[in-house]
Each structure stands twice: as C-alpha cells, then as structure tokens.
Amino acid sequence: MTHIKEFFTKLSESSSNQNISNIPKKKKKLFLALFATLLVVAAVIGIVAGVNSRKNSGDNGNEPHHAILKSSCSSTRYPDLCFSAIAAVPEASKKVTSQKDVIEMSLNITTTAVEHNYFGIQKLLKRTNLTKREKVALHDCLETIDETLDELHKAVEDLEEYPNKKSLSQHADDLKTLMSAAMTNQGTCLDGFSHDDANKHVRDALSDGQVHVEKMCSNALAMIKNMTDTDMMIMRTSNNRKLTEETSTVDGWPAWLSPGDRRLLQSSSVTPNAVVAADGSGNFKTVAAAVAAAPQGGTKRYIIRIKAGVYRENVEVTKKHKNIMFIGDGRTRTIITGSRNVVDGSTTFKSATAAVVGEGFLARDITFQNTAGPSKHQAVALRVGADLSAFYNCDMLAYQDTLYVHSNRQFFVNCLIAGTVDFIFGNAAAVLQNCDIHARKPNSGQKNMVTAQGRTDPNQNTGIVIQKSRIGATSDLKPVQGSFPTYLGRPWKEYSRTVIMQSSITDLIHPAGWHEWDGNFALNTLFYGEHQNSGAGAGTSGRVKWKGFRVITSATEAQAFTPGSFIAGSSWLGSTGFPFSLGL
C-alpha cells in the first residue's frame, strides 16, 4: 500500500510539471488506462487491508460479543437502532458477554438520550413567544423526563440483581412495568401539544428526541421480555412443572398488599399521622399542605385523614412522597374538587384535580372531582401514575377524561367512575373490580366512550380491565340515552388493550360495543375482549367485526386479565386491606 501511495505522489508531481494536453494521443490513452487500473487495484487493496484491520482489532461478525448483540437485537422492533447504538459504545466487545449486558448497555444509552432531551426542553423554555399551554406542556415534559430517569435507574438496579433477589416472574413484571411506564412518558410529553399550526413548531422541535427515546425503551422492553420469557421457560422445563407465583392470594387480596395495609383499607378506626380539616380543627387546612409536610421517601405507611368538607384545590402526591394514604370521612362527605381544563389553557396531564405519582399510594372514602363541564373538553378528576396504588370506596366524577390511569400498576375496588368521553383512559396496567361505571349526559351531538386505552407497543404489560362491575347510565342520561350513543371504548393508541369481563352491562351500550378512533386506525392491532358479561347490553352477536376484537371463551385466557396475573396482585394487593378477588 505504501508503494501505491508513492506512485501516486510521483504521478501527481509529474502531472503538475507537464500538462496532459502535451502528451501524444497514443501515450495519453495508455496513461489514462494505466491510471484507471491503478485506481482499481488501490481500492481493492484498501478494502482487503480494512477487512484485515478489523479482523486484527477483534471487531468481527464472528466474534462472540457480535453474535450476542445481533441475537439480542433481533428480538426488538427496531433492530438496526438497537445494534448501531450499542456497537458505537467504545470497547463494547469487552462489555458484552450476555443478553443481560446488552440490555444494561441499552438502558444506559437511553438514559444519556433522556438527559439530552432534558437540556433541549430547558432551551425551548427560554423562548419568549411561548403560549400558556406550551409552557405548561414543556413543564409536563420535564416532569415525565424526571420520572423516566427514575424508571431507567430502577430498571438497571433490578437488572443487576436479576435473577437472584426476587422470583423470575416478579423480576419480569417489575422490569416490564418500568419500561412500559418510561415509554408512556415520551408520548405524554408530546400529547401536551396540539397538532395545529399554533404550537406545532414546539412539538416538532421535541418530536425526534422523544421518539428516539421511545424506540430505545421499546427495544429494551423487547429484550427484557425475550430474556425473562426464555428463563422462565427453562425453569418450567427443568422443574417439570408450571411456574407459579409464590403467593397467589392472602385472604383474597393480592400479595403486594401487606396485612397491615389490608387492615387500613377496611378498618373503621385508624390512627392518622396528620389530620386535614377545613375548619382548622386539624393539623392542616388543605390537603396539599399535609402532603407537602409528609416525609419523603418513606418506607412506612403515612396516613393523612381528611375530615368531611369540600376542598377546592389541586393536589399532587409527587414521586418523592411514597406510601401515603388518604382516608376520608365518606365518599359523599370528603370531596376534593377542581376545574382545570384544556379549553382554559391546561394540558390534559396537568388538568387533574388530584395527581398521584408516589409509589404505594392508597385512598379510601373520598371523592375526586373536576367540575369544568363537558364544554371544557379534557378535564381530569384523578390522574394516577403511582405504582402499586389502590383506591377503595372512592368516587371519580367529571365529564371528558375523568380517570387518567396514566402508568404503572393500579387497582380500584368498590369505586364509582362517571363521565362522558374517554372517561377511563391512559396506559397503566389497571384493574377496576366491583365498580360502578356510569356514563353521564354529554353535550349535544357527542358520543360517550367508557374507555380509551393508550398502549403503544405490543410488549407493554398494560391495559384496562373491568371485572365484576356494573356499566350503566347516570340519572340525567338514562331518560335520553337513545340520543347519545355510548360505547365500551375506542383505541387511543395503536395497541390499545381493554377487557370487560364478568360484568353487568345495561342497554345503554350500543350493540356494536366498540367505536373507531379515526377510520381504520388500530383496528387490526388493538386487543378488545369480553368474557362472561351479563345484562341487556352484553350480547356479542352485533359486536364489531374487527380483527382485534374477540369474545374470550377460555377461562385460562381470561385468567391472564385478573388482578392476580395482570397487575401482579398476589405480591402487593394484600397489604392494602381493601377487599378484592385475585381470580375469576
């Protein structure tokens, strides 16, 4: 190769001293032919040298780390992104010895991308021409980024302990929950901006970064599912038995609810750590003040009693406030109410009267309400992103978007949820059991949609399950329900998943059962199931004929959507003290 370079150097020097036009015609042809031949030879030598160089450096497709990386990425939805992102890491060959290593590297790369997005949003906030809603939406993005970073860090910690600290099934469910929530956060950020020209420029500035992180999270989720599914299959085979949960029920409660929390949820006499009373007879006059004063990062249950009264405020239980419990004096006596809404400049995310993010949150005997009304469009009464959270004897009252089951694992029992359009929506793994779900009278020309589930990826362990509940109309809608068609749900996102089972459905529900979101969007990729429902609106003969809709006839398939299976209820629900059923 050195000789070739020397030749071209001399050739260049020669040509610079002699004009090619002065060379005789035959010699000129010979010269050009020789020159072209040498170029080809040089190119071939260069390619061979490059290949040999890569072989010598160990960056070889036959190397073990390359095979592990390629195999791991092949299970993802975006394999090229998966491979290129990790292959670009310096000395990746020394770090990859297993699929677990690939996943951990992917999570660390994703964390860096999330941090990059954070600084991009901070830069956007310095713009002077932002609207009120754009500012609110950008702050929503900062909040969801903060949550995403926590989820990625927790996933790395869980992965480092895999598969020893917990059962395989617990590891699998926890990891899939964390990555599903991290993915959901990226869409939540973008959902805060409308698609119209008024604030499209801000959304466009964010979109590439958010979508990139969402794809990276999707890849990590797919690899986690592939790894844990494989390991559990090996365990089943080696043990020659079906892998089961360590504890399926504790007196009918999911096991993640400790005996102490079960008592708290059902006991009529509980000693609180703080008391809220609007008349000044407690420690605090507002719920928000009591939450702010609660210990952060607590591992013990911290109980806030909210005395009877109407509390006109917006309450946030942040991620730092863990294991908080609200106890009211009765669902008709303790009411937390607000009226934030999208029409007046809020985002859907920030419109919530009460927003709960802190892990292990419990509430009982309270009403969460948004009084904005149907003309104000999205106006959330309760938003929940708290993992392992549960609500008992609570009312959620609003119109459009009443209950926002945003992310993570959630359980609602003996609750009333009332609204109009998409009034139970989000991308949590949420089970509503023994609840009353009532459609209200909407604005003229509107249709009622009970659910709008937001699953964006086929590997997310999310969905809305309504079990052993009652679906009907409120007293204001019932006399005129024929004028307002009501459906069980519509697909908000591409892989929307909702199951209604063992519930009573009145004639309020349209015979088709389900409604489109926008034309054919998601009709082939959604999962809508019905199992053993009763009532005048439960007949399935007139239901939609979409590829994604099914009548579930197998008890085994239905069992997958019970609290014990769908939200890993056997590991945590028992601690709440709320009454529940884990199975069918």
From Swiss-Prot:
Stretch forming the signal peptide: 1-42
UniProt-listed Enzyme Commission number(s): 3.1.1.11
Site residues by UniProt (Transition state stabilizer): Q400
Positions annotated as glycosylated: N108, N129, N226
Major localization class: secreted
Positions that bind substrate: T348, Q378, R490, W492
InterPro entries per UniProt: Invertase/methylesterase_inhib (IPR035513), Pectin_lyas_fold (IPR012334), Pectin_lyase_fold/virulence (IPR011050), Pectinesterase_Asp_AS (IPR033131), Pectinesterase_cat (IPR000070), Pectinesterase_inhib_dom (IPR006501), Pectinesterase_Tyr_AS (IPR018040)
Top-level EC class as recorded in UniProt: hydrolase
Cell compartments where the protein resides: Secreted, Cell wall
Record's miscellaneous remark: The PMEI region may act as an autoinhibitory domain and prevent untimely PME activity during transport.
Function: Acts in the modification of cell walls via demethylesterification of cell wall pectin.
Name of the protein described by the UniProt record: Pectinesterase 1
